Amino acid sequence: MRPVVSTGKAWCCTVLSAFGVVILSVIAHLFNTNHESFVGSINDPEDGPAVAHTVYLAALVYLVFFVFCGFQVYLARRKPSIELR
């Protein structure tokens, strides 16, 4: 199997996706626990767990991108490079 994207783009996507998964998971957890700073104001949503569910789904999308891009990095590293003699 051949990689779909270049190695540099795959690494960039992998790092950004990992960051997205971590940040969105933390935000979703804070909504799920009805943290004061996320649901305590007048303009904030009242149903924290419903918002947390949506944010967890967004983190899942980032996780899929993380797996895909990580697999692209694996494929690029596995491919033998050209050797000059």
UniProtKB/Swiss-Prot annotation:
GO terms for biological process: endosomal lumen acidification; Golgi lumen acidification; proton transmembrane transport; vacuolar acidification. It is a multi-pass membrane protein. Its main location: endoplasmic reticulum. Keywords: Endoplasmic reticulum, Membrane, Transmembrane, Transmembrane helix, Vacuole. The chain crosses the membrane at residues 11-31, 55-75. V-ATPase is a heteromultimeric enzyme composed of a peripheral catalytic V1 complex (components A to H) attached to an integral membrane V0 proton pore complex (components: a, c, c', c'', d, e, f and VOA1). Accessory component of the V0 complex of vacuolar(H+)-ATPase (V-ATPase), a multisubunit enzyme composed of a peripheral complex (V1) that hydrolyzes ATP and a membrane integral complex (V0) that translocates protons. V-ATPase is responsible for acidifying and maintaining the pH of intracellular compartments. This is V-type proton ATPase subunit f. It comes from Saccharomyces cerevisiae (strain ATCC 204508 / S288c).
